[in-house]
């Protein structure tokens, strides 16, 4: 940049302007404002972070933007100053441009090098592709960075370097043989997975260095990477997602699982799960080794634990993109801190095994696939933290089968965050075809934004719109600015009640674009269609007044009052929501939290939420506190992420949080009122809206709800990351069955079996108190008797299914076989299908399937020391919702129309009535013609 602004500032300080009268200064200032040389660029709503300014970015900046100092001077003085400084500015500009042009040959993606090699021998081009592939592991498309990374690998271990280079070469050649996209090959996108495969196969080999036979599996595994990459990109293209290092993870996991530690030809390093609590003395922690962990964590992306190798890799990143280097270091620090929060052994932290996944996640979110703003910078930190705990969970789970975690944690967590949908303008995801490196990504975003702002709003000429804008500015008294709405402001008239669905599905968009062929007004009746009965009664009263009696009229009036009173507390309590829209945000937020508490059971009713919270306090006040905190944090996070306001108001971003808080308290081995437990409750509850948004983006392709999948993912990751032997947050020890249960059928107690019905309903919230289950049944009945009925039926089905496979009686009495069947029976029996006798039978079948699936998953997950949670319900209900049939009695509702079973059936009957009327009209018109 030119140094002219600094010189101008110094001149002003040395010779201050003479004092002038206030009137003359006002006229001069007014003339400056009307001058055509006044900067007319609009302000950026996303202020640029301090970036390395590239030559192409300098071209975007106007000369007036170089200085933020406004100097008031006369026009003749301005012209003289410009004439005298024009040669000096031109020479300084040429010098600065030549410097940046020289730097641009080495930084960024070195596009000039790629263009120069186009007409050179293929050997040189192939070498460029291999070097770019080595650097693409860290999202860097720069051959110089790749060369430096190879130097760092040689410092670590020359044998590993040979294996990694062979993997890159073979993977790139396989992509050429398969005729993959040439531009992707030239960018190294088909080489980086082979690089990692070669390196990690050598790292995990139990043989000594230079075991040349190992190059055979390296060759074959690397050749599979382009095939897997092409297949995954075909699937991920539907959501415009990258494949990351998934091909490497698949190939490496298959190789290590196929060989193992006891293979004669290719033995691998033995990986075993933790079997005892680690011995940690906090006074023995060494700060120099902790600081050394930062470059070591970066080096562990390539499987290297040498701090000098990590430092060399950081230099390679800085050459291409300082922002990538910065976020890599930040990600390594976040992983280090996350490891300390769960009392990880110091040796594991020092080797950087907690950091490398965080490095990749922080780089990917912090400016690579999202435009870098302060919002996405914070999002990158959250993603790195989530990735650290996910990595710990996957490491413990995969250690059971003797396989290392690879970079699965990075892939799964980053893909989840890339699927996030938000209305926040500061979170902008780039199209995959426009992704280069963070600095260029931000320049592209600012350029596109500036061009959009300069476009005339009504399609007129640019000068006309500019002139119109000046006239509007002059007529300031007549300008009306839109009133800003609070984050708590909800247009209740536009809310469509939905259950377990987030965002706007494709089906809903089609309905808004293509209206139905018949008119439909959403019925305002509640439950048993009492208002329709009243209207018919009024007609009879008007037509047959002479035959009515005073008793009948009084009964009708009483029925009206009862119906109106019931409508205030049953169903969705829409009147409560509409009455709160102009009240304090605190009352609105309380309504959302209560609705979120009841949405676990598909109920959108704050009164039911109050009863459920009361039942939780009857069970255990500590559990109730933890669950309420989870609901609050999950709802607040959804507000911060600018999720759909109607979904937040319906409690659809709170129910996963309440389950997370409850089950973390239930499975804690520290007992009640262990207040430190609230910290992981807060963290894991905050991830629920992110997981919900990501899953809804995927499931919207099939118009499916996300159910309690976010809760299942969050709790499973937490329990797997901590485990029974964790010092800070130990969980209950779960072990698989190793002996045949001793069951005597004469010992079965029928009263306890009957009590298992309400207990099974209470176990949806992790409660085994029958009184709590009874209160939950009352809460369900208040909102919808049909939901209450199917909940009881589902719990009964689960109990009978458990008896049919000789489940130990204690498990049946505690309701552990009934809660998944309860949720599945409600979901199919009138919630997402219209209630008919066919769907009623389908709900019973789904409940039975969920019970047996629950037993299967309980046995499988117990091997990893994990509970089944509500995985069986989610998998079975989603399976039955994907069912297609020509049976007219099985009608699946669009997600945008789902409310509660009684209203769902009223909607369906009104649609059928209108459809039949339209068919009769068409038939009559055809008959007349």
From Swiss-Prot:
InterPro entries: Ammonium/urea_transptr, Urea_transporter. Residues 1-89, 451-480 are annotated as: Disordered. The chain crosses the membrane at residues 133-155, 162-179, 184-204, 212-232, 241-261, 310-330, 349-371, 378-399, 400-420, 609-629, 647-667, 675-695, 704-724, 773-793, 812-832, 841-861, 863-883. Residues 31-42 have a biased composition (Low complexity). One of its GO terms (molecular function) is urea transmembrane transporter activity. Residues 1-11, 55-88 have a biased composition (Basic and acidic residues). Residues 458-470 have a biased composition (Gly residues). Glycans are attached at residue 742. GO terms for biological process: urea transmembrane transport; urea transport. Keywords: Cell membrane, Glycoprotein, Membrane, Phosphoprotein, Transmembrane, Transmembrane helix, Transport. GO terms for cellular component: apical plasma membrane; basolateral plasma membrane; plasma membrane. The modification Phosphoserine is found at residue 486. Gene3D superfamilies: Ammonium transporter AmtB like domains. Belongs to the urea transporter family. PANTHER family: UREA TRANSPORTER (PTHR10464), UREA TRANSPORTER 2 (PTHR10464:SF6). This is Urea transporter 2. The gene is Slc14a2.
């Amino acid at each position: 940049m030119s140094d002219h602004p600094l010189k101008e500032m110094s001149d002003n300080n040395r010779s201050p302007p003479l004092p002038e009268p206030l009137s003359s200064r006002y006229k001069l200032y007014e003339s400056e404002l009307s001058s055509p040389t006044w900067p007319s660029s609009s302000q950026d709503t996303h202020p640029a972070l301090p970036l390395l300014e590239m030559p192409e970015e300098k071209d975007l900046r106007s000369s007036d933007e170089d200085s933020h100092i406004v100097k008031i001077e006369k026009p003749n003085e301005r012209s003289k100053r410009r004439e005298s400084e024009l040669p000096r500015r031109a020479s300084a500009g040429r010098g600065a441009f030549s410097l940046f042009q020289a730097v641009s040959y080495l930084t960024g993606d070195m596009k000039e090098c790629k263009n120069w090699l186009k007409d050179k021998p293929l050997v040189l081009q192939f070498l460029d592709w291999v070097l770019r592939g080595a650097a693409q592991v860290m999202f860097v498309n720069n051959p110089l960075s790749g060369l430096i990374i190879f130097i760092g690998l040689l410092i670590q271990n020359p044998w590993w370097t040979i294996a990694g280079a062979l993997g890159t070469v073979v993977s790139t050649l396989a992509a050429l043989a398969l005729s993959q996209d040439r531009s992707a090959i030239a960018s190294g996108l088909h080489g980086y997975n082979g690089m990692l495969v070669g390196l990690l196969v050598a790292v995990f080999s139990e043989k000594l260095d230079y075991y040349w036979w190992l190059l055979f599996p390296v060759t074959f595994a690397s050749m599979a990477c382009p095939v897997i990459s092409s297949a995954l990109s075909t699937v991920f293209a539907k959501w415009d997602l990258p494949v990351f290092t998934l091909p490497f993870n698949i190939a490496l996991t298959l190789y290590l699982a196929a060989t193992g530690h006891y293979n004669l030809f290719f033995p691998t390093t033995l990986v075993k799960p933790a079997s005892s609590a680690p011995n940690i003395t906090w006074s023995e922690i060494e700060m120099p080794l902790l600081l050394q962990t930062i470059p070591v964590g970066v080096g562990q992306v390539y499987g290297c634990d040498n701090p000098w190798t990590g430092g060399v890799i950081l230099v390679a990143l800085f050459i291409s993109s300082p922002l990538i280097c910065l976020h890599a270091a930040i990600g390594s620090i976040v992983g280090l801190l996350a490891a300390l929060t769960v009392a990880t052994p110091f040796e594991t932290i020092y080797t950087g095994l907690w950091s490398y996944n965080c490095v990749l996640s922080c780089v990917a979110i912090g400016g690579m696939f999202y435009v870098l703003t302060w919002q996405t910078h914070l999002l990158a930190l959250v993603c790195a933290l989530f990735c650290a705990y996910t990595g710990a969970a996957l490491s413990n789970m995969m250690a059971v089968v003797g396989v290392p975690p690879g970079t699965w944690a990075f892939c799964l967590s980053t893909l989840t965050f890339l699927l996030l949908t938000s209305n926040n303008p500061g979170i902008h995801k780039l199209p995959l075809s426009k992704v280069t490196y963070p600095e260029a990504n931000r320049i592209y975003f600012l350029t596109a934004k500036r061009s959009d702002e300069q476009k005339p709003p009504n399609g007129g000429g640019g000068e006309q719109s500019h002139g119109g804008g000046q006239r509007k500015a002059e007529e300031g008294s007549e300008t009306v600015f839109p009133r800003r709405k609070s984050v708590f402001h909800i247009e209740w008239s536009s809310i469509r009640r939905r259950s377990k669905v987030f965002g706007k599905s494709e089906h809903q968009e089609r309905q808004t674009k293509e209206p139905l062929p018949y008119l439909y007004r959403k019925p305002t009746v509640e439950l048993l269609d009492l208002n329709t009965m009243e209207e018919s009664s009024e007609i009879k009263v008007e037509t047959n007044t002479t035959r009515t009696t005073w008793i009948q009229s009084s009964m009708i009036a009483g029925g009206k009052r009862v119906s109106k009173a019931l409508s205030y507390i049953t169903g969705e309590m829409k009147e409560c929501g509409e009455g709160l829209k102009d009240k304090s945000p605190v009352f609105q937020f309380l309504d959302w939290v209560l609705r979120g508490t009841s949405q676990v059971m598909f109920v959108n009713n704050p009164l039911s939420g109050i009863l459920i919270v009361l039942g939780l306090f009857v069970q255990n006040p500590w559990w109730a506190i933890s669950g309420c905190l989870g609901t609050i944090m999950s709802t607040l996070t959804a507000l911060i992420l600018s999720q759909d306001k109607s979904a937040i108001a319906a409690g659809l971003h709170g129910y996963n949080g309440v389950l997370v808080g409850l089950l973390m308290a239930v499975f804690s081995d520290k007992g009640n009122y262990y207040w430190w437990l609230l910290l992981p409750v807060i963290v894991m509850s905050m991830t629920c809206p992110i997981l919900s948004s990501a899953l809804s983006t995927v499931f919207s392709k099939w118009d499916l709800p996300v159910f309690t999948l976010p809760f299942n993912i969050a709790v499973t990751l937490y329990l797997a990351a901590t485990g029974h032997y964790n010092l800070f947050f130990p969980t209950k020890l779960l072990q698989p069955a190793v002996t045949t249960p001793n069951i005597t059928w004469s010992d079965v107690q029928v009263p306890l079996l009957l009590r298992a019905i309400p207990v099974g309903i209470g176990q949806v919230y992790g409660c085994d108190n029958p009184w709590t289950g009874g209160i939950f049944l009352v809460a369900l009945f208040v909102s919808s008797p049909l939901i209450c009925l199917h909940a009881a039926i589902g719990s009964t089905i689960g109990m009978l299914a458990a008896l049919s496979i000789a489940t130990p009686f204690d498990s049946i009495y505690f309701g552990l076989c009934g809660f998944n069947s309860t949720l599945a029976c409600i979901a199919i029996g009138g919630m997402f299908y219209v209630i008919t006798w066919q769907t009623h039978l389908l709900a019973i079948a789904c409940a039975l399937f969920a019970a047996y699936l629950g037993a299967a998953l309980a046995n499988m997950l117990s091997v990893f020391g994990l509970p089944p949670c509500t995985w069986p319900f989610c998998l079975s209900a989603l399976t039955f919702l994907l069912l297609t049939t020509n049976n007219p009695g099985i009608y699946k509702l669009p997600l945008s129309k789902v409310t509660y079973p009684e209203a769902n059936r009223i909607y369906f009957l009104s649609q059928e009535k209108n459809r039949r009327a339209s068919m009769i009209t068409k038939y009559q018109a055809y008959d007349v013609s």
